[in-house]
UniProtKB/Swiss-Prot annotation:
Function: Potential calcium-dependent cell-adhesion protein. May be involved in the establishment and maintenance of specific neuronal connections in the brain.
Protein name listed in UniProt: Protocadherin alpha-9
Listed SUPFAM superfamilies: Cadherin-like
Organism name: Homo sapiens
Membrane-spanning intervals of the chain: 698-718
Cellular compartment(s): Cell membrane
Gene Ontology molecular functions: calcium ion binding
Amino acid sequence: MLYSSRGDPEGQPLLLSLLILAMWVVGSGQLHYSVPEEAEHGTFVGRIAQDLGLELAELVPRLFQLDSKGRGDLLEVNLQNGILFVNSRIDREELCGRSAECSIHLEVIVDRPLQVFHVDVEVKDINDNPPVFPATQKNLFIAESRPLDSRFPLEGASDADIGENALLTYRLSPNEYFFLDVPTSNQQVKPLGLVLRKLLDREETPELHLLLTATDGGKPELTGTVQLLITVLDNNDNAPVFDRTLYTVKLPENVSIGTLVIHPNASDLDEGLNGDIIYSFSSDVSPDIKSKFHMDPLSGAITVIGHMDFEESRAHKIPVEAVDKGFPPLAGHCTLLVEVVDVNDNAPQLTIKTLSVPVKEDAQLGTVIALISVIDLDADANGQVTCSLTPHVPFKLVSTYKNYYSLVLDRALDRESVSAYELVVTARDGGSPSLWATARVSVEVADVNDNAPAFAQSEYTVFVKENNPPGCHIFTVSARDADAQENALVSYSLVERRLGERSLSSYVSVHAESGKVYALQPLDHEELELLQFQVSARDAGVPPLGSNVTLQVFVLDENDNAPALLTPRMRGTDGAVSEMVLRSVGAGVVVGKVRAVDADSGYNAWLSYELQPETASASIPFRVGLYTGEISTTRALDETDAPRQRLLVLVKDHGEPALTATATVLVSLVESGQAPKSSSRASVGATGPEVTLVDVNVYLIIAICAVSSLLVLTLLLYTVLRCSAMPTEGECAPGKPTLVCSSAVGSWSYSQQRRQRVCSGEGKQKTDLMAFSPGLSPCAGSTERTGEPSASSDSTGKPRQPNPDWRYSASLRAGMHSSVHLEEAGILRAGPGGPDQQWPTVSSATPEPEAGEVSPPVGAGVNSNSWTFKYGPGNPKQSGPGELPDKFIIPGSPAIISIRQEPTNSQIDKSDFITFGKKEETKKKKKKKKGNKTQEKKEKGNSTTDNSDQ
């Protein structure tokens, strides 16, 4: 029942006051109820859930709690209906004593979200205590000679109730001698007394028995009585008289023991014993007064003998009497009022109740961490308390009610920075000097999963040798999570993806807890040079957070692949490769070539060739190129040389340890009249090598003759066209014109337009290209070397170096298989004793200048899986130092490329011949001679015909 009203005539003003108070309650956010004391168990107090705006269904889930601040379980809440009721006996006098206000302060706490409500339940007083006198009987001794209107003080009754229930009225039993003098409300210091209205006569009435009744103002009324026994004494004319009826003294509560309070003075007009006075407290004074004060019976001095406490009692009213020694003795009375002055002797008292500990680091601002109540027993400024908190912390104190504070979150928390706080709450009063008290609050910050695992690097590079054992440990990834407990428990996994037709997990795996990365199978550098993948780190928080790191695993090559020989199409019966060489060949003629590849890389794939010791004797007229594998003659062959030479060529890589392969080459020396040169593709028959060789040669001669006839006709036509353009011939550089012989195959035919452009270039001549059939004699000018000095040397006679722009073209590089690696060095020798030119090719230009044959790289438009053997007539005239060979044999093709040098600034149409990767000139000459332009127009038709053969 909220603000229950009383049914009295002043109900309307009271109702208005209650309405105003209710409006204040709503504005302050607090609830006020009232309940009478001594209410029975289960008495309804109020619908607390409804008044707080809480739904009944959420009381239990939100952990509804009721805290009565040390008042026990006087009140409880029914969580089913949200009603506040009386749980046990409430005694107002026991709770609050004689205090005018008595209330039970409750705190209602609900969670999710955390809310705190303050509820005051006022305990209404009922008239359950009757008035009580200090004693049930009081004896009075009054002399018969006392004049009328003499007053004799009495100790009044007390009522433990308050208000109207403690408002006492007195009634004296009917008699003819005395009436009762009751002080008014503004005469509280004046005691109750009997007033004599008729003279006493001891002889007539020696004793009087009166009954004093005290009645309170409660309903129903309660009463208390005391028996008054009045003894009439014989004459003692004058009673002692104090100079004041009321003495008022103020003492600080920390007054020292023995301090003089006051020295009341009484006088008696009688003489002798009738004038001697004895001082004392009244007989009905309380024991508490006797424990705090002492009165000297002779001097009347009152001193302090006990501890004074303002918080216990703010004033002491002491009845004092002075009695003479006459007979009958007469007494005088006065009252001493001792007011206790408060001093700041009580420090504040702090009580802390933690609610949300530990606090999650993502808690919202304003979250209540703890409730703090403070009490100071002093009064006024000495009892006014202010609270403060340790500075520089993410918390603050908020005053929620009188002497109540809430510790709330003021700033965002970060457990990774500070995991716990030791807070100190200081309560300081307003006294001088002020007193204070402190209390500590430990606030632990609970972790939330707000940090993802982090790797030290975003990418790691790992080097692993190939052919590793399955399951070997290759690396360990480690991620650190700044969170705690399960939020920092990191597990690792692969970010799955596919590598070709296989999944990543078939190559590597990662241990979920340790982060160790294992190779599940042997890695092969030739199959997989770089394995790039990601490892994911996830924590165990909810929701889980994660990050990825990239691993680049480079598979290092080991020398695990021996050189592999490129097998020719036809073999001899004994597995060796046979080749026939004319005895008339001179020194330096390339008669064959051993081609091998190594699947490894780097030095492990750098191949070298050498003859086996048993075959590399001085009598054998052959040698093998160290890095090219080309077999050439070391001298001119003669009749003393064995007709069949067996060569063992050892192919070795540069790995550690080196791996080798051996090729067997059978060289047959034949007379020039016995058989022409045949290629290695037709050197061996199925049943009879010699019969097959003859048949092949017949067809070969017929084909060569046909091709040669066509070539002669082409040359005649070309000569006629050249003669018709004689004015432009003078523009050619000095020297014998170089003829171009085209093969009937047509793959290496050389157009007249190309010939014209080579010849008409500015400055000195560049290297020209000559193609001819191996079965025919070389064209005039290509086999004779008398005119070569002017074509291969400049005006100073110094040998020219090869064009530095010789490179693999994109088409040549694309044709090479990924497992075939370039040899580290190919050697092109200009001549015996001359400087060498290194070529980064699989099979570089021949080091023997006599033959002038080269083979293109593997995949450069020829059959890479065939053996290539070429021989040609030796040139009796050797090139000078630094000169380049003028012919190259194209493997797999019956054509020889002849290279001659022209001036470096000549403009060449590179669309008409193969340059083996030579860079195309990016800038053409802007100025050409007018005659060249005219000649090119005339030869346009002829060049079109020639290009169609290519």
